[in-house]
Design a protein with these regions (language model features):
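Sec-dependent N-terminal signal peptides
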Residues: 4-13
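Secretory-pathway ectodomains
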Residues: 18-125
Length: 125
């Protein structure tokens, strides 16, 4: 009887982890220009872009591209929206997220504005 109780307890504890609530975030290809590498932060709660030194890898700055509004009555992880693509365009970084929204980050001013998606941004297969 004790074995069945232990087995039942293990199943109850492990059950939430058996079925993933969402697919893994997309693999985003970092882009480099003028010795600076731009990458998407792995946090889906808010879309951040990180700029780091291409040689040392040390972080230079990070900018919040968008905020994800989370409904407290729903599971949090299914509401996260990850960045899915980055592309350099002159002195700007074009960003696309899983919700098919696009943003333009001015790399000098570090200002963000909405951008009309006209092409696919680089997404690792």
């Amino acid at each position: 009887m004790k074995k069945y109780f232990v087995l039942l307890a293990l199943m109850v504890v492990a059950w939430p982890g058996i079925f993933a609530k969402r697919i893994p975030p997309p693999k985003v290809i970092s882009v480099t220009q003028a010795g600076i590498t731009y990458s998407a932060a792995g946090d889906g709660r808010s879309g951040y872009v990180i700029a780091s030194d291409a040689k040392t890898g040390s972080e230079l700055w990070r900018v919040k591209i968008y905020h994800v509004h989370v409904n407290p009555f729903m599971e949090e992880d299914v509401q996260w929206i990850y960045i899915s693509g980055l592309k350099l365009s002159g002195n700007a970084l074009l960003i696309r997220n899983e919700a098919a929204r696009c943003y333009r980050l001015d790399l000098e001013k570090k200002s963000v504005r909405n951008y009309r998606c006209t092409e696919e941004l680089s997404i690792k297969p």
